[in-house]
Amino acid sequence: MAPITLSQIDEDLKDVIQTFFEIQSAVHGYLGPETQQELVKKLKSLTVSLQTLSAHAAPDPSYVQSPPSRTGLSPADPPVQSIQLPPEIIDYVDAARNPDIYTREFVELVQKSNQELKGKMEAFASFRDVLAKEMASAMPECKKEVERVVKATGGSVDGGGCG
């Protein structure tokens, strides 16, 4: 059996939403016994649509993830089993929050962390260069070794470079 793709789940969801819309219309225009049979048919249709969606979305224990080139599936339409969402995003949706907010906050946090790390790297590089300069002037016999270490780590003994 071919794996269920994201587009298939999308179609199943559209069917469920369409059935809900039809039920809403039938309830809104309810005229009594003559529309009761139609409403019953729509409710049965909803049950079938939900069962189909549930069956397609259920985890497949026999599923083994393989590269898209081997399965012949488009990367734009991956198998449902291969999609992994962070639990935090699921919590956001469960709390009726927009998952885009989580993504934005996550990106901002990563940017802040990257800026802090960049600052630390620049501070350590500057410290390395100053330390090397002071060591070379205080211990001339070690100057060649200090220069070798500084150059290997991307620095400059004369204080002009920053790795």
Curated annotation (Swiss-Prot):
GO process annotations (BP): regulation of transcription by RNA polymerase II
Subcellular location, record wording: Nucleus
Region (Disordered): 57-79
InterPro entries registered for this protein in UniProt: Mediator_Med10
UniProt keyword terms in alphabetical order: Activator, Nucleus, Transcription, Transcription regulation
Domain of life the protein comes from: Eukaryota
GO terms assigned for molecular function: transcription coregulator activity
Compositional bias annotation for Polar residues: 63-72
Keyword Lyase among UniProt keywords: no
Any one GO cellular component localisation term in the record: mediator complex
Protein function: Component of the Mediator complex, a coactivator involved in the regulated transcription of nearly all RNA polymerase II-dependent genes. Mediator functions as a bridge to convey information from gene-specific regulatory proteins to the basal RNA polymerase II transcription machinery. Mediator is recruited to promoters by direct interactions with regulatory proteins and serves as a scaffold for the assembly of a functional preinitiation complex with RNA polymerase II and the general transcription factors.
Quaternary assembly: Component of the Mediator complex.
Family, similarity comment: Belongs to the Mediator complex subunit 10 family.
Protein name: Mediator of RNA polymerase II transcription subunit 10
Species annotation: Coccidioides immitis (strain RS) (Valley fever fungus)
Gene: NUT2
